């Protein structure tokens, strides 16, 4: 036989629960921790030209977000890669996601492209800056994961195609330019230089993408005939003439080791910030290690 339950308010926010003829327990609602906590909304100040690091870890880091960053230019953002939970992370930093519609997709590995799939499922329009071969790989992956047709995907993903060594003005920007090249990785992977130029003001931010920068190994592969002289020169160059250089520093045999960068001159080291971190920063490092959520301004 089921007992009848009676709930009686004995005073404001205090209730007795009575089962049958016996009082079972008392509930004080004002003693229950409220889930409605007051959150002070973060105010994020966007640099006119600079970067914010969304994440700085490798795909195997346990204590860092996967590597992704925003290049800010003309009060708008360009994501370099877009990681899982991107929109949630941006919100936690106080960043308005509506100010960021462009994504440079370096390559198709899940620690770099998961957020693009999420945007697609949320029907958020994305301008995808990448090469044709990387874009075609993205389409195949997106179709396999979502069962959407190419036509449906392209309702929300617009390709801005880039070709190695051809500088373009980024659509939607007035004085911001993008230059693409391929890095050295296990699959086709891009790197870039983003330039703001107006009058006498010119600043460049470069990004290595995932890459194996290792001069002795590249020399060996060249000697074996794996590269042309031009390709070798490109692999060892392209990014170093920037005002801010963002470089891969680990996560496997096809990534750059810290020691492979030590030959760089002092001026270049001072301009270089390390991401895709797979290990703890070196003690007394000659380079700056980026931090999740950090912003660097070149033009305020």
Feature-to-residue mapping (PLM):
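Active-site flanking residues adjacent to catalytic metal/cofactor-binding acidic residues
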Residues: 80, 106, 207-210, 247, ...
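Active-site metal-binding motif and surrounding structural segment of the metallo-beta-lactamase
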Residues: 77, 84-133, 236-246
């Amino acid at each position: 036989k089921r007992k009848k339950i009676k709930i009686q308010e004995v005073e404001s926010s205090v209730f007795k629960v009575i089962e049958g003829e016996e009082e079972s327990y008392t509930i004080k609602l004002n003693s229950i921790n409220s889930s409605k906590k007051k959150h002070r909304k973060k105010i994020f100040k966007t640099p006119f030209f600079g970067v914010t690091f969304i994440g700085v870890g490798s795909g195997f880091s346990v204590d860092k977000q996967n590597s992704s960053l925003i290049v800010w230019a003309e009060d708008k953002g360009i994501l370099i890669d877009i990681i899982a939970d991107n929109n949630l992370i941006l919100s936690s930093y106080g960043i308005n996601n509506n100010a960021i519609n462009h994504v440079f997709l370096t390559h198709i590995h899940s620690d770099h492209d998961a957020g693009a799939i999420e945007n697609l499922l949320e029907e958020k329009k994305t301008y995808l800056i990448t090469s044709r071969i990387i874009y075609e790989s993205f389409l195949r992956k997106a179709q396999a994961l979502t069962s959407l047709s190419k036509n449906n995907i392209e309702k929300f993903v617009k390709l801005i195609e880039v070709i190695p060594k051809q500088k373009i003005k980024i659509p939607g920007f007035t004085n911001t330019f993008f230059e693409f090249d391929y890095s050295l990785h296990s699959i086709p992977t891009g790197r870039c230089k983003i330039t703001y130029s107006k009058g006498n003001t010119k600043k460049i931010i470069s990004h290595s993408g995932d890459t194996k920068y290792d001069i002795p190994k590249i020399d060996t592969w060249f000697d074996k005939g794996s590269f042309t002289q031009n390709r070798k020169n490109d692999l060892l160059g392209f990014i170093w003439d920037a005002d801010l250089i963002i470089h891969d520093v680990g996560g496997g045999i096809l990534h750059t080791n810290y020691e492979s960068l030590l030959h760089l001159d002092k001026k270049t080291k001072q301009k270089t910030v390390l991401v895709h971190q797979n290990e703890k920063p070196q003690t007394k490092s000659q380079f700056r290690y980026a931090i999740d959520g950090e912003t660097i301004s070149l033009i305020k």
